[in-house]
Every structure is written in structure tokens, then in C-alpha cells.
Curated annotation (Swiss-Prot):
Protein name per its UniProtKB record: 3,4-dihydroxy-2-butanone 4-phosphate synthase
One CC-aspect GO term: cytosol
PANTHER family in the record: 3,4-DIHYDROXY-2-BUTANONE 4-PHOSPHATE SYNTHASE, GTP CYCLOHYDROLASE II-RELATED
Keyword Lipid biosynthesis: no
Organism name: Vibrio cholerae serotype O1 (strain ATCC 39541 / Classical Ogawa 395 / O395)
Binding site for D-ribulose 5-phosphate: 38-39, 43, 151-155, 175
Highest taxon, organism lineage: Bacteria
Site features described as Essential for catalytic activity, chain residue numbers: 137, 175
Keywords: Lyase, Magnesium, Manganese, Metal-binding, Riboflavin biosynthesis
Gene name tied to this protein: ribB
EC numbers for this chain: 4.1.99.12
């Protein structure tokens, strides 16, 4: 069965997006899948403003361990976060910046609590470059202007979801893995979502939603 058939039990694309937005407003996580011919992976996504240590611990335990903070270009510029490399030749052009750590309120920076502290420090609209040390254990990503209509990536999907939910435009993501360390695919992602009360949606759902409602996002 393909992705669309497997997700049909969660409703049509518009319903799936609306369920995800409501979950984020309630402080719950969502699972976002990209296209089957792209990475074909699912990321756990949480809103920064409601992110808890328990949620971060779940991400570290159940995912790849590379916890990323998705930011707008404006916030990344405000923090003076340059791209990790000048010449990005990765397959999907993922816009990693230099990694970061909060300068205050953390120990080694690697614990769930420390990562939450770093993330909330960086996402604060009043944050300054000097609030952060570089490198660190959190990996910021710059979301492309135009969101999923410009790039069909998890980074843009995360920031779009936050804006669509009326939340601060910053979210965290991490790729869901199976217990054996392999990448979770659609059937495993759906099972995980049911177990943890997380709505499942796709980038394509978001594209359809934005086009249907003519959503102009930053």
C-alpha cells in the first residue's frame, strides 16, 4: 500500500492538517512525513514554546538523536547563525547552521533538559548571538522563505505548522527510527502515532492545505 492509502484512516489531507494544528496548540507532538520519492521518512515535531524535558527525552530515545531546531531566516540572522558549510552539496540541500549550546543554565549540554534550555534560549525573540556558545549539541536549521511551497522539506513543514497553528515560528524535529536503528517508514510511523497520540500528516497534505486556503506565510 502507498502512503496515501495507509493514511486514509486519519481522514483527508485537510482533516489531517487540522488535527495536527490542534495537537500542536495543545502541546502535543505530530508526525510529519515527506514525499515517498524524497527521504520517505517521518519526523516527530514539537512546538518550542510548549516543549518539555519529557518530550525531549522521548525524541532522544525514539529518534536518530540529531535533534534540530527549525527557525525562520530572520531568527537565524538575529542569532548570527551562519550555515554549517559554504558549499552545500547534500542531496536535499538541508540548511544546517553551526551547532549551538546555551551559554547559561546548562551543564554538558547533552541532556534532555540542557537541550530544551538551549532550544528555548535560541528561539526567544529577544535572544542575542552572545546568548549562545558554538558548537553545541543542538542543530539549528534555516527554513526557506515560502515554506513548503518553496521547499518540500521537514524544516519548512515545521515552521509552517507553527505559523498555521498561531504559535511562535520555531519547532524541533528529529527523525523517527525503529528499535533496530533503521529508519521508520509509513507503517511504523502510523503505529507510533497511534501509540503516542500523535496525529500523522504529510508535506503534500500541507501543500494542498496552503493552496486551498491561500495561506501566505513568512
Amino acid at each position: 500500500m502507498n502512503q496515501s492509502s495507509l493514511l486514509a484512516e486519519f481522514g483527508d489531507p485537510i482533516t489531517r492538517v487540522e488535527n495536527a494544528l490542534q495537537a500542536l496548540r495543545e502541546g502535543r507532538g505530530v508526525l510529519l512525513l515527506d514525499d515517498e520519492d524524497r527521504e520517505n521518512e517521518g519526523d516527530i515535531i514539537y512546538a518550542v514554546e510548549s516543549l518539555t524535558t519529557v518530550q525531549m527525552a522521548l525524541m532522544i530515545r525514539e529518534c536518530s538523536g540529531i535533534v534540530c531546531l527549525c527557525l525562520t531566516e530572520a531568527q537565524a540572522d538575529r542569532l548570527a547563525l551562519p550555515l554549517m558549510v559554504v558549499n552545500n552539496n547534500s542531496a536535499n540541500q538541508t540548511a544546517f547552521t553551526v551547532s549551538i549550546e546555551a551559554k547559561h543554565g546548562v551543564t554538558t549540554g547533552v541532556s534532555a533538559q540542557d537541550r530544551v534550555t538551549t532550544i528555548k534560549t535560541a528561539a526567544n525573540p529577544q535572544a542575542k548571538p552572545e546568548d549562545l556558545a558554538r558548537p553545541g549539541h543542538v542543530f539549528p536549521l534555516r527554513a526557506r522563505a515560502g515554506g513548503v511551497l518553496a521547499r518540500r522539506g521537514h524544516t519548512e513543514g515545521t515552521v509552517d505548522l507553527m505559523q498555521m497553528a498561531g504559535l511562535q515560528p520555531a519547532g524541533v524535529l528529529c527523525e523517527l527510527t525503529n528499535p533496530d536503528g533503521s529508519m521508520a517508514k509509513t507503517p511504523e510511523i502510523i503505529a507510533f502515532g497511534k501509540l503516542h497520540n500523535m496525529p500523522v500528516l504529510t508535506i503534500e497534505d500541507m501543500v494542498q492545505y496552503r493552496i486551498q486556503f491561500d495561506l501566505k506565510l513568512a
